[in-house]
Amino acid sequence: MADWLFFVLLIMHWKLSKDFSSISEIDLRAHDALFDRLLHVHLQRNHLFCLSPSEVVALRRAIQFGPQALHVLSTILRRAQDYAASVGSATRHAVLMPLGSAVREPLGKEFYIKAEDASWWLEHPPSLYVENAVSDGGLYNFILSSGLRSLIGSPKYLMVRPFHGGGNPLGSVMEALFDERIQGICICDRDDACAVPPFPKDTTSEQAHVALHKMRVVDAQGQSEPRNPFFSFKITHGWGVENYIGPNVLNLFFNSHLEACTSRSAFLNAFPDFPALSETEANEWFSINFKSVTQDAENIERGLSGRFRIAADSTRCGLLAGLSIPKSVIPFVIASAKSGRHHHELLRAFDRDMRINIYRNAVRDLTQAAMDALAADTQMNFA
């Protein structure tokens, strides 16, 4: 039975519809409980409530908030520009409409939610669903936050809270505990040369896709259904989470763990200029199943020819198939990402990996999905 983890994450960016600027103060006060709730979950880092300075002034004037809510409004006012930039970086966000509004279809980045329905969304925040609680969860936390720092300059509006759910398979857990209301991101290992259904039988990706399709969250091709725009089903760019360990990060591990010299020699045999990789070698990196030293060389060849149109002989594929990343690499990355003598070296190694085109694109794909669903102000304080 596979371990699974979900991160209790932040739902999405919330904005107010322009309709609020044209209603009376009396009508605005009718929303006081909802605004108080939004400010509370913003303080709890469960949502990112984005208001313009004029909207903050209007709410303060019309509604008598308590000290805690006023504190949150002051923070939102002070960081209004930063929040606006965060909204701009997301591909979609929620727009709250006043009570009694007509139903509106999504338009561009905007997904419209009536005030009457807002509590439903607030009570069902999204999560990041992955396999293998401690290892996968910790590594994705590092990849997402570092990717955000590298791509837009700061990870402070992305927050991850781990929650270990036990040993049940990911697909059955999502199906048993959630329904079409599920929000967030599910990331599964590819475990194949192909990234679209049908997935290999009895793999996490196959079981998760079957469950999500039954829940009417994704279609037969694994794409999000329009009825639920705040859920993404993602398949790793390589065979698994291990492929997101770039060559420079792996080289840092080898430099600090001399006992892993045998593994390092294998990578040097396959990539003579390691950790530097040519474009072809970088594509090969994402075609290797680093979890296993018994990968079939034919799978490597199928991935290279099918995904990258690269012709590789059987000898080369056999050499690549014998590579594996030591199990202690992921714990090393997770520990160094927090603190320790290798912390800054790790960040520099990650930045070097981000100069590799295929690696940067793979991280950007996950980071964009995270920005859509996992927005939060991690600098909020409870004073």
Model-flagged regions — what are they?
Residues 191-197, 224-256, 314-318, 324, ...:
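TOPRIM fold recognition
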Residues 2-107:
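N-terminal extension/subdomain marker
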Residues 2, 220-222, 382:
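Conserved, well-structured beta-alpha core segment at the onset of a catalytic domain
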Residues 45-59, 63, 287-362:
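C-terminal structured domain segments
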Residues 82-194, 198:
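RecA-like P-loop NTPase motor core
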Residues 204-328:
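Activity-critical C-terminal alpha-helical subdomain
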Residues 75, 142, 172-176, 243, ...:
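Charged/polar, solvent-exposed surface patches and flexible loops
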Residues 195-207:
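Short, flexible/disordered intra-domain loops and linkers
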